[in-house]
């Protein structure tokens, strides 16, 4: 798709002839925020976000879906990476949600799926450290994807989604998944875990395969339903349903493709 709006990517100084660092986890942000900085954590501006204090790479005229940002949210960044990223390793996180690849600096050894940390220099140093990068790269020698530890619900993925977002989106999503993978999508009626945030790290080829499959499913649903303005009966912002169904898609994709995944805590910045 070609968007009429803009999507901006904030990139660090060039470190190789292609113009990209060899390894990058892109940090999606739609506003000015204090972020951990390193040669492998790369802010990417969504929804037309600009920051005059850093280098900004405009995608004007390039293949993007920035005009869908209200509904697709962080998926607009994921689409931009699919079309333009040339890193040796690629990942996506958010300005308040980061993956951690080494134990957090805290005494609790039973880390939850989501680990809150204060927004301090010490936290940023920890998240952007070489130790994190090296551990991440070593994990990718063994695993296909690094993903957040899953959120575990007392009910199935299907039931929890319908309770939160309603049956309309779920029904269309299941039909689209069946178009992509075949009739059997019983995974959702058996699994109680899901990977939140559309957050991951992987290799370029595995990313491209995943992203193309994801957008075939999500775009088909959006083509049927379009932008949803108001649904009083659902709990969360209904216009963001493409992002919500994408979160559930990741678990199904991992299951169907038989991928090896490493599940790691997600840091939530207070």
Question: What is each residue range found by the language model?
Answer:
Residues 2-270:
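ER/Golgi luminal nucleotide-sugar-dependent glycosyltransferases, focusing on the catalytic module
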